[in-house]
C-alpha cells in the first residue's frame, strides 16, 4: 500500500516516462516492448483524486501516428490502472480534456478504465449484447517472460467460457 498520493503520482510519472519515446526510463521496457508516447511529449501535471489519475500532456502528445493513437491510450490506461488506488485515468492535452482520438476522431470515455480494453479483437456483427473478455497470454521471448493482455469483444450467443476456449485455440501469440 502506498503512503500517500505522492507515492502513486511518482510511480505514475515513472511509468509515463518509460512509455515515452526518448524518455529517461524508456530503457526499462522489456526488449519486445516499445515506447509509444511521441518524442518530446512533456507531462505538465499529474494528480490523483477519488481514485482517478489526471495527466496533462504537452501538445506533442498528439504527434502520434494514426496507427498507434489508440495503442498509446490503451498502454496508459492498462499501465496506470495497475497502480493501487488508481481505478481510472483522465487525459488532458494543454489543459483540455481529450474527448476523441486525434486522427480517427473516435470518441473516448472521459474517464478511461480497464473497460476500455487493450490489444482489442472485435468479433461482433452488431452493437447489441456485446460482451468483453480479457485473456492474458504468458509469453517467452528470448528467455524474457511476460504477460500480454488481449481484450475480445463479441456478441455471439455462446457463453464466455466458449469464447475464451475458441480464442485460445487460435491464439495470436
Task: Please identify what each model-predicted range represents.
Residues 1-173:
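Bimodal "functional hotspot" detector
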Amino acid at each position: 500500500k502506498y503512503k500517500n498520493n505522492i507515492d502513486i503520482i511518482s510511480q505514475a510519472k515513472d511509468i509515463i516516462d518509460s512509455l515515452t519515446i526518448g524518455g529517461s526510463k524508456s530503457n526499462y521496457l522489456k526488449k519486445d516492448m516499445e515506447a509509444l508516447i511521441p518524442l518530446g511529449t512533456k507531462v505538465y501535471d499529474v494528480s490523483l483524486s477519488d481514485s482517478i489519475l489526471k495527466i496533462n500532456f504537452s501538445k506533442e502528445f498528439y504527434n502520434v501516428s494514426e496507427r498507434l493513437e489508440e495503442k498509446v491510450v490503451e498502454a496508459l490506461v492498462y499501465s496506470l490502472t495497475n497502480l493501487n488506488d488508481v481505478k481510472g485515468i483522465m487525459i488532458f492535452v494543454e489543459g483540455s480534456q481529450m474527448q476523441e482520438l486525434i486522427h480517427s476522431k473516435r470518441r473516448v470515455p472521459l474517464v478511461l478504465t480497464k473497460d476500455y480494453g487493450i490489444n482489442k479483437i472485435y468479433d461482433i456483427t452488431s452493437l447489441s449484447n456485446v460482451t468483453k473478455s480479457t485473456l492474458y497470454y504468458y509469453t517467452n521471448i528470448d528467455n524474457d517472460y511476460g504477460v500480454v493482455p488481449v481484450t475480445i469483444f463479441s456478441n455471439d450467443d455462446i457463453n464466455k467460457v466458449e469464447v475464451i476456449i475458441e480464442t485460445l485455440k487460435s491464439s495470436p501469440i
